[in-house]
Structure formats: structure tokens, C-alpha cells
């Protein structure tokens, strides 16, 4: 596969690199904001699960254009390359200490908006992925209840499923309006969407806590069909299609043929704006590049062949020829895995 193939298959990936966004997800936030104006008048914003930082970039660009005194706090477990004007916290969003640090950076005040584009590493088992995403939204809501001011807004990624209406009903207990937003840059074939909760109004007597394992119980059978205030598609319908492949020649693929001289420049491949600084998979990649896994595989194959050969001589069953767990652990220890 050529290095330009993804530029052809994913126009938003290509545009993100050309416009110096760290990820294509920047367009999702911009399209939601264009539709709902959720960043208008915001002076304090929190970006949860922020790495690699594309949503923080959008916050920085749009908030500082309107108010130079705005403050932005980005939180992630992983380290993230610096972004001008963004305060970065490497911490756990399930920790009260992290919430206290946010409020400290805001000089004792609470945030106008909390956004979260986080998602678990998907397994391909849809029910499990949906459950893990729901757990992440719960964690995001828990810290949001500590740092969001009344009247503030909350935006989070969700994976749509048959149980999604329960989540909307639960959120409606804390926010006056709940929308389901689907940006144009989010692939239509994906179950990804964004729950947008407007005007934070917690119930009387509500005490924020990080210990919640679920939102307040709601009888799913009693959910009203109008629990969501609207399903909204965001973005220009005549614009780029996230499902379509485009030619590298910008003249041939620009919608409606409306391009200026700057956009007519010859296509040039660009690397990603900001690769991960210290990804969790880096150690595994280093071991793979150094040949550790190949050596381990070869060693185990030799051991298995020897056992099979010995088994034939001693007439062992196939199950008896397989290396034991202890033998595999010794092999792994040998290669420092």
C-alpha cells in the first residue's frame, strides 16, 4: 500500500495534514460548533482524553480569536506535545486530584464547557466496545460534575447502540437539552456520534463524586420517545464526503469546482502533523523492530518441533506435545517480554 493511499481514501485525513491539524477529528468539533455555536463566549474550557490534541487545537484557535484571556486545560493519561495557549495535565480523569488541579488553573472558577473525544481501543466485539465507551462517558461525566459550572455544556463521543436511549435519558436528568450530533466528517458507516448536553442543571441536593459506577437509575421502559431534543447532522452536505475516495489532483475533487489559486497548487504528500510522543505500544514496536519477537517465535517453533519429534518416538498424544505454560513463561522471561 502506497503512502498516498490514505490521502485518497480519507479526504479529512489529508485536509487535516494540509491545515496542520493533529488529527482529522478536528473537523468534527468544528462542524458541531458551526451548528450549535457551543464555543461562543467560552472563557474556560476543558478537553478530556485530549491526545493527540486536535480538539485542543480547535479550542485554542476559536477561543483566543474571541478572547485573549480564555483558558484551556487539556487532560490525558499519555504525554502530549505542547500546544500554544493550552495548559496540559497528564493525569487520570477518575481522580479528584485531577479535578482540583483543573479548578486551580481556573483560579477557583469552573469551566464553561467540557469536551471529550476519548474512546477505548476497539476490540471488534461491538457489545463490549459499546460498554467500554459507556464506562468512559461515565468517567467523563463524573469529572465534569466537579469542574463544570451550572449552565455549562458537555460534549462526548458515544457509540450508538440499542441501549443508547438509556444514556440520553440519564443525561437529561442533569442537562436541560440533549442532542445527538453526527458531523459530516464522521463516517456514516461508523456507529460513532456525539452526545451534546446543554445547560448543566444538576438535581437539587446532587453531590458530585468520582465513585459513581453508574448514573442515577432510570427505568428503560419508561423512557419518553422525545428524551432527545434532536438528532442533528453537522457540516455542509455539499462539502467533502468522509466515505468517498478522492483523486490526489485537487482541481478534480474540490466540491463545485470552487477553488482559488492557492488551492490549485500541485499535490504534495505530507507527514502527520504530530505523531504520538510516547505511545503505549512503543515498547512492543521496539521489540518487534529489534527482532525479539522473531527470535522468540523461532525458539518456540524449535522447541515445539523437538517435542513433536520426541512425542512420535514415545507415542505421545498431540496435546502432550504442546509446551506447558511454565515453559512458555520461561521463554518469555528469556527474551525479557
Swiss-Prot record:
Top-rank lineage group of the source organism: Eukaryota
GO cellular component, one term: cytosol
Localization terms from the record: Cytoplasm
Biased composition (Basic and acidic residues): 304-318, 327-337
Name under which the protein is recorded: Putative tRNA (cytidine(32)/guanosine(34)-2'-O)-methyltransferase
Lineage per the UniProt record: Eukaryota, Metazoa, Ecdysozoa, Nematoda, Chromadorea
Organism: Caenorhabditis elegans
Annotated segments matching region Disordered: 304-337
SUPFAM superfamilies in the cross-refs: S-adenosyl-L-methionine-dependent methyltransferases
